[in-house]
Amino acid sequence: MSLENVLTPLRQYRPKRLICLFGCGGNRSAGRRKGMGFVSGRLADMTVITSDNPRFESPEAIMTDIETGVLEGGGEYVKICSRLDAIRYALEISDRDDIVLLAGKGHETYQDIEGRRTQMDEREMIRQILEEKNAGIVRRCDN
């Protein structure tokens, strides 16, 4: 599984904590969700389960499928449906010696929700959140 191929080498850097944020796309293989959750639960110190192109499926149902796998993997986790809030949470709880992996979006700059593509550039979101964090600005995350 590709998530395992990323998390395993990241462990070699010996981070204080490895925080893995991801979601699974809707209207795709539901069987992979539990497996990806299991991998993250086993290899990451904290899994942040979030939304990633739910398409016409319920984001909450997708996240519950992932949660089942994380629990079986013995992992600590939190579920935050809003991808922006999830990224903010992952970065806010991270320390200097942690690694935060945001998996899934890559080059995509949108969220596909109920047939509509909503603009969402994670790189810009991360830049803004880190600038706020470095400036000491604290925002409340709804989780």
Map each language-model feature to its residues:
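ATP-dependent carboxylate-amine ligase
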Residues: 1-143
